[in-house]
């Protein structure tokens, strides 16, 4: 089978990139696999090229490269095929529209898999008849803007399948009633770590992820203040950095100082690989308001750490068995987090049992098992292709109505944004 993945930027780092690379490497043992990265901003991918996988790009952002595309006239013209509702829309352009379209028109693959909503929509709009078309959802439907959800409900009907990473999100997609589109929940895969399992006797709690508001590290620090007061021999290590718009490192550092936790809570920055750092702890903590899946939960469990996590939508509750391989607590409940941590901290035997249970339970996320599930879906779709009646375009009337409403919505959003700028300027003058 020839499989082609379409990825936003395979040269960067992130959960979608990591899980795509892991899946591609597993599939490459039996199939011909390529990853097509829309963008390339560096010479070598941060995660390396998966063994047996071909990696190529469509738009070169390297200024020192002879193929630099930043001066192409279409690079500065807005995208019209890639949907405006996707949060990455401003990074796309008329050039990406053309390059992605040309790629899809010529790709020689049995299965084409797009890996973010905007690319899923573009796949539906530009791919010709022939290959099985799969849109992967690595986030959650309810977290998308209204504009993007509207395009999803309209365009995904042209796909063969949509896969989500949780059953809860699969139910949300099924509620869209996309005729003829197969919808399955297939979790992300996490390979077995190349380090020995964590020592349950280690007195370290580990957390990892971007330093952004949704992760609620401020709540975790407050909860750990109670832990440190009761068990001053324990430490909390938080790994990760913020993104360009929401780096909370300074605020968290001030909070640590104000709570007199300098000897107990540490902002560790980014670690790659992360597995050796997980293995230095005996507990993991997740305090997010929402998680599309919960990659760090599985990563921690694969290293032998039970996880205390908020029972937020959607992932944690489908990964952790409460009271067996971790604890689930209410969202935004500082006292519940500290109580759950202390319950495991103060129970050495219980913590060791939970660690063993985490190792066993997390085996279901092994790449071999997850790849086999994807292969099963794709093979069934390919086998039924002859009798499948998937449309390759919408009726002219329906398409015109969708486009007209979309244009009106875009005009409304633009007017609202301009009004907001004007109001802010007037406030500065008053």
Model-derived regions, located:
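Nucleotide-activated donor-binding/catalytic signature segment of Leloir-type glycosyltransferases, i.e.
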Residues: 249-269
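Conserved donor-binding/catalytic core segment of Leloir-type glycosyltransferases
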Residues: 4, 194, 198-215, 221-224, ...
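Glycosyltransferase donor-sugar binding loop
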Residues: 37-42, 208, 235-251
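Donor nucleotide-sugar binding/catalytic pocket of nucleotide-sugar-dependent glycosyltransferases
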Residues: 135-138, 142, 156-194
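Conserved acidic donor-binding segment of nucleotide-sugar-dependent glycosyltransferases
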Residues: 321-323, 327-334, 343-348
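N-terminal strand-loop element at the rim of the active site
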Residues: 7-13, 31-87, 185
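Short hydrophobic beta-strand element within catalytic cores of glycosyltransferases
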Residues: 306-310
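Aromatic "clamp/platform" in nucleotide-sugar-dependent glycosyltransferases that forms part
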Residues: 270, 289
